[in-house]
Amino acid sequence: MAKKSKIVKNNKRRDIVARYAQRRAELKQIIQSPTSSYEQRLDAQRALSRQPRDASAVRLRNRDAIDGRPRGHLRKFGLSRVRVRELAHAGQLPGVRKASW
């Protein structure tokens, strides 16, 4: 079980990323565009650097949806490997079967 404060902090980051996502995408497009002038790129880079650090999606951490475990996250289920194993053995994940060959 992860600390509640870490889970809450990650959720706040997720909200901040969603709030700034469109503006960040616009600025990045200006920076990467070959048609934009040097001054436009410089202004876009400055505007991007003025945004909050937590507005970057790279700072998000994938966590287990049930207990917030930060490691061993399986995207397909949104759970950690430990939780997937427990739920699969209990038959609570539809369509998941133990391998047999």
Swiss-Prot record:
Entry annotated with the keyword RNA-binding: yes
GO aspect biological process, one term: translation
A GO molecular-function annotation: structural constituent of ribosome
A Pfam family it matches: Ribosomal_S14
CC terms in the record's Gene Ontology section: small ribosomal subunit
UniProt keyword Ribonucleoprotein, yes or no: yes
Keywords from the UniProt entry: Ribonucleoprotein, Ribosomal protein, RNA-binding, rRNA-binding
InterPro entries xrefs: Ribosomal_uS14, Ribosomal_uS14_bac/plastid
Lineage: superkingdom: Bacteria
UniProt-annotated stretches for the region Disordered: 35-56
Function: Binds 16S rRNA, required for the assembly of 30S particles and may also be responsible for determining the conformation of the 16S rRNA at the A site.
Family to which the UniProt record says this protein belongs: Belongs to the universal ribosomal protein uS14 family.
HAMAP family: Ribosomal_uS14_1
PANTHER family: 30S RIBOSOMAL PROTEIN S14 (PTHR19836), SMALL RIBOSOMAL SUBUNIT PROTEIN US14A (PTHR19836:SF23)
Assembly and interaction partners: Part of the 30S ribosomal subunit. Contacts proteins S3 and S10.
Protein name: Small ribosomal subunit protein uS14A
Natural source organism: Mycobacterium marinum (strain ATCC BAA-535 / M)
Gene that encodes it: rpsN
